[in-house]
């Protein structure tokens, strides 16, 4: 079962959803990556929480510019802290 989202993560996801529903349709498709930066951000926040999810999202958005060719760039998997070495 997935852990519950923090209030901060919920707020950030709400802001991203607002962007997706209001601003993104006006701008048209511009993201060079798959999944899009906004979908990446939501997944990163759900998977890693507010701090690390925000950091991963910021790094992704900063890579999304005309000099980067883009392509497939999924959210990294969350490693299990209880794994055996």
UniProtKB/Swiss-Prot annotation:
Alphabetized UniProt keyword annotations: Cell inner membrane, Cell membrane, Membrane
Membrane topology: Peripheral membrane protein
Annotated signal sequence range: none
Entry keyword annotation includes Magnesium: no
Any one GO CC term of the record: plasma membrane
SMART domains per UniProt: Haemolytic
Cellular compartment(s): Cell inner membrane
Superkingdom assignment: Bacteria
The family this protein is said to belong to: Belongs to the UPF0161 family.
Name by which UniProt lists this protein: Putative membrane protein insertion efficiency factor
Organism: Yersinia pestis
Upper lineage: Bacteria, Pseudomonadati, Pseudomonadota, Gammaproteobacteria, Enterobacterales
């Amino acid at each position: 079962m997935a852990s519950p989202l923090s209030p901060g993560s919920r707020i950030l996801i709400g802001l991203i959803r607002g962007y997706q529903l209001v601003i993104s349709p006006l701008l048209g498709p511009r993201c060079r990556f798959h999944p899009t930066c906004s979908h990446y951000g939501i997944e990163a926040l759900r998977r890693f929480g507010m701090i690390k999810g925000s950091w991963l999202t910021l790094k992704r958005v900063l890579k999304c510019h005309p000099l980067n060719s883009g392509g497939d760039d999924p959210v990294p998997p969350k490693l299990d802290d209880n794994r055996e070495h």
